[in-house]
Amino acid sequence: MAKLIVALDYTYASEALAMANILKKHVEWVKVGLELFTHEGPSIIQLLKRMGFKVMLDLKLFDIPNTVKGSVRSACLMDVDMLTLHILGGEHMIKAALNEVQSSIQKKSHSPLLFGVTILTSIKQGELPGYNQDIASMVLNLAAYGQQWGLHGIVCSGQELTKIKALYPSLSCLTPGIRMSYSQKDDQHRVMTPSEAVKAGSDFLVIGRPITQAEQPIKIVEDIISSIM
């Protein structure tokens, strides 16, 4: 069964922890993104882990190999369960990150799953100057590299899932841009409902505002889980 990851897209720890406290008996995974992590630092990870959550640290790392390697080492020390990085960072960057995870395993330390970002779900066709390929083709090419280089999984929109799973059935796929049929798209463009994404082959669904901005977030979580079972 696909896993639900609730995106705690807040600025302050107080807001994120308040929502986490509401959801802690109903959700296994939460996501900490760039805004919250930049404001609160590693302490927010520690607090969420103490509450019993598995934590996806969504920093979308994209830097020189040595810098990314050091960032992955820090994530391992924070007991992060999943970490994102851009596949466009290239083979040397990806393999430096994977080597650091392997080193953590050998030291019997905590080691996160590494998921490679393909193309952000907020990007529409024509918004990438200098790239002549259509978005779907770019995502498929990046997924191929992610598989080849040994990533644990990739991040892609629901619209590319079916083709990716047909080509790489063992590659885990994490899908952001998930919206309920009745909810707004917000700043997402390539979106899909939870049941559609699971039918297409998604292994992890990242959902934020449709849950965290709802009057009854637990009810929305229950509806989502029911729709993907």
UniProtKB/Swiss-Prot annotation:
Homodimer. This is Orotidine 5'-phosphate decarboxylase. Catalyzes the decarboxylation of orotidine 5'-monophosphate (OMP) to uridine 5'-monophosphate (UMP). InterPro entries: Aldolase_TIM, OMPdecase, OMPdecase_AS, OMPdecase_bac, OMPdeCOase_dom, RibuloseP-bd_barrel. CDD domains: OMP_decarboxylase_like (cd04725). The gene is pyrF. SMART domains: OMPdecase (SM00934). Substrate binds at residues 9, 31, 58-67, 121, 179, 188, 208-209. One of its GO terms (molecular function) is orotidine-5'-phosphate decarboxylase activity. It catalyses: orotidine 5'-phosphate + H(+) = UMP + CO2. GO terms for biological process: 'de novo' pyrimidine nucleobase biosynthetic process; 'de novo' UMP biosynthetic process. Pathway: Pyrimidine metabolism; UMP biosynthesis via de novo pathway; UMP from orotate: step 2/2.
